Amino acid sequence: MEKQKNISIKKFANPLSFPHEFRTNLHKSTFLDASLLELPNISVDKTKNENNFSITDKILMESLKENEFKIREFIKNQESGNRVLMIDKNSLKELFNINDNQALDLIFNQYVQSTRPNLIRKSSNSSLNIDLKKEIKKKTKKSRKSFSRNSKLNNNDSKIDDKNDNYIDKINDINNFNSDIEEIFKKKKEIENTLKIPIGGNSFPIPVEFNNNNNNNNNNNNNNNNNYNNNIDNNNNNNNNNNNNNINNCNNNNINNDNNNNNNNDNDNNNINTVDNHDDDIINNSNNFNKNEYPSSNISPISPKSSISSFPTNLNNSINNTGSMVSDSLSSCRNSISSSSIDSSVASIPITIQSIDFEDKNIKSDQFKIISKSNIENTIETNPIPPFNQTNNQCEVQLQSHSLPTILKQPHIYKSKSFSSSINSNSKIKKIKKSRSFEIESKINLFDVINHIYLNLSKVGSEEQKITSVFKLYDIYDKGFISRDDLKEVLNYRTKQNGLKFQDFTMESLIDHIFQQFDKNMDGYIDFEEFKSELTINNENKVKEKEENTNYNFKEENIGIYTEKESFHSLKRYLKIEGSKLFFISLFFIINSILVITSFLNVHANNKRAIELFGPGVYITRIAAQLIEFNAAIILMTMCKQLFTMIRNTKFKFLFPVDKYMTFHKLIGYTLIIASFLHTIGWIVGMAVATGKPDNIFYDCLAPHFKFRPTVWEMIFNSLPGVTGFIMISFLIIMAILSLKIIRKSNFELFYYSHHLFIGFYVLLILHGTMGWIRPPTFWKWFIVPGFFYTVDRSFRLFKRTHRVEVLDYCLKNERVINLTFSKPPSFDYKPGQYLLINVPHISKLQWHPFTMTSSPLEDKIYVHIRVTGNWTKKLFRWLSIKKQLQQQQQLYNNIKQQNVLPDGSNFIINNNNNIDQIDLEIGLKPFRINIDGPFGSSSQYALKQKQVILVGAGIGVSPMASLLKDISLKKQRLQLLNQGDQIALEQSKNEITTKFGLGNLEKVHFFWLNRDQHSFQWFEDLLIDISTNGNSNLPKISINTFNTRVFPKNDVRVFMLWNGLDKLFKAQGLDPTTNLPFKTHWGRPNWDTIFQYYSKKYSGESISVFCCGPSQLSKELYEKCRYYTCLKTGGTKFYFHKENF
């Protein structure tokens, strides 16, 4: 039986290890990044050399060995159940005993950047955090350079010289506050009666404790807004109390309480509890505050346990001196309050500080006021304030250390001049924000540091030491064993770290499978011996593994070693693959070179008068003008999409590089811009030279065009060639800048609209040479043929190929992808992998965006998956979200009305809480129609021409591949149904069936899909399940290889137990727990060298087409692999690369 297994492994030495193909035979995955049985392949880890570690890693490894006991004791005392233990720089220094401040800064900053945002930050995407990251990155780069420079000079020293502590700037200088401010922070622990002002600050409730004697009190409040007096009369006859408050400028407030019933007077020391509400809660509390809920009782005095006088009196000076933090202490109102017995209850008093004078310790506000949210700029409502009890003629209101900076985060709500004068500029507020943000950011997770150290230790030393280091990654509390809770804690931490999510029952099943494998004695714990025995590889496997690893290293070492013969062979491969592209590029440069030579000779022979007037610069201007005319004409040919689609369907598709039209468009555009600048500069210099020439020379050259001699500025800015020339150069600059990749991705509309300036550019270019200063205009001769083709192409697309279709269904997936389903027009014939242009009139009537169709031509509907990235797609997503909501609510209303629950004529109100520009409810409920233009050809439509095809998609780039896979799957199903029917009828219609449902010579499709999110695999879940179930029933076969690139590779010691448990769970239930698909998802990025080596051997002598749609980095990598592994010898494998261009 063992021999049979070995034979199977040798036969199917597939580095991809497809579970649905080799589930019964393949017991060991030879995929390069790990194997399931070997777990973390420690004994053959390539990172054995200690010199591979950075200097900071070495320092941490040595420090952990020396201070391991102290660090573990600290972790035990601060035990955290979620593997998050935040420490600052000083704690890191004490725990690891790092005395070199320079090394400490470098280590700390490294982990500040690498610490997961979801573990330490609440808003890691805020602009403040982004600015902070940039600052830390800049400082870290400077620190690393200086640190490495110093370390090279001191290689013989065991430690870095302490004199270099001040060599670099401190990252935390922004966190050093004024000494007075630091004293305030120290005193915050002593404050018991505190008030926390939450973020937002429109109004905030202050819970105040009252002694309650009457439970049912009706309070009638009469407000006098003119005098800012509140009179409350409390008459408790029949449990009715009338309270009269007179609050004048927060001073000398009199409270008269008349009670006919017996009241108990309880004077207790009450603490003002902190309130932590968000903006919405604050507003709700303010609006729901009822004026008839003031209790009638004596308010217990607030115990002044911490003196206000101990705080600095001039906080404004502290702001100006430090520029980073405002004192968190606010003085109290000096209120003279008198009261009688009032019942005790808890009342939430909504107040907003209207004016704050930092020059005085007291609040100088005429009154506590509430600023209305509806009109925060103008409307101010005055609400009564319940009575306070007299306490030494002083009412204390104190703030915690983080309250006042929170107020300053929204300074626009305060309208007082005194407050505005205390904060002189927004820059100081930004500094305060930045310092507060940095205080949150400047901590690291101790578990991240320790895990990284043990990860490095697992790569050095003996096998025993490596396994010990791996064991300590899980036994972080040094118990000597791994309990179920410890393992669950580690797995939860790793799943969050890798962006994975599991249900609770899945995690429990996962742990059960791991303990079933590792816990040999079934005692509920995994000790070191059990852990070691499971990871130890027997001697036979070691020898075999060493041989395999040696062979692979030999292959890897030979990669990139080019002899003279190999270099020549590489050139031949490049010419074979890129022959047509190189031919047209060479032809392009040859034509431009010929134009340069002919223009030079023509000027030298026919424009001697112009040379005499303008100088030698005429040569530059005329050569550049000739290049502009040629390139401006042929660039139109690269914009004829319909023409390229027609060429793709003919036999000439291999002669013209139609897949490279974007490359030629950019090349011609660059040439046009350079020639335009040379032409402009040449004419400016020439005109300056012409000013020094006598009149006879000037009129001898330009006599027909000028009756009076103009100045140089008049020739430049007051002539038709000058004005049109500067406008054209402006158009080119705008189009070039807005065509940059960063702008196209962030704001496609700018790129799209700016490119329509080419219409004005051509009009001005025709007018530019009509005056004929040097020679008659000739651009129209170059323009007529390309302009004709472009006009026909554009007209054909505009009048013949534009369709208005109705969207039948749409699905919004995870706020990232929109799935549109619309009807297929009768004359809309397309091939799998082609794309179309979509226009949504409700969003924009002018914008057309390209999207690949993910449906098969055999279907009567068209499917399109749109990724939400730019402004247009975001507007579309918001509009469809509202439309979906309106439809659901309308359907609910119709269902209720059919059940006669609502009376006839009832109005059904739909609340619209989303923000979108003036959406009409009637339009939202009407059928959804869009305009489509196309189809247009793409490289993916060639996929069915080869026997072996490799499809690679990244993210939403899988769309053309999904169309191909769906088309292949449907054709196989149709052929299978036809084969089961009448054989005579099948023979008669064989040609028709082959044309419609034929798959050509295609034998197998190798599909690769790379994603950074486990939920992204659900976009085409039904298609993948159908293919995995029926994909190998007959030819062509389809193999699926999905990769989650965000997570660590499965051989990583940090996740090997997680991966192993998931593998056991997959074998038990037949579904991948991360994707719920019936095949295993690989972790990490694919190793393309191993994959191409495997295909090169298995399909020797065949041609393999590689189609890619994804990031430019992935396309470039695959392109290089195709070039390298293509063998031009007889019997060699040839790889042909194709890339999607939109």
Curated annotation (Swiss-Prot):
It is found in: Membrane. Residues 172-246 form a coiled coil. The keyword Lipid biosynthesis does not apply. The chain crosses the membrane at residues 583-603, 627-647, 667-687, 720-740, 754-774. Heme binds at residues 665, 679, 755, 768. GO terms for cellular component: NADPH oxidase complex; plasma membrane. InterPro entries: Cyt_b245_heavy_chain (IPR000778), EF-hand-dom_pair (IPR011992), EF_Hand_1_Ca_BS (IPR018247), EF_hand_dom (IPR002048), FAD-bd_8 (IPR013112), FAD-bd_FR_type (IPR017927), Fe3_Rdtase_TM_dom (IPR013130), Fe_red_NAD-bd_6 (IPR013121). Residues 135-147 have a biased composition (Basic residues). This is Superoxide-generating NADPH oxidase heavy chain subunit C. It comes from Dictyostelium discoideum (Social amoeba). The gene is noxC.
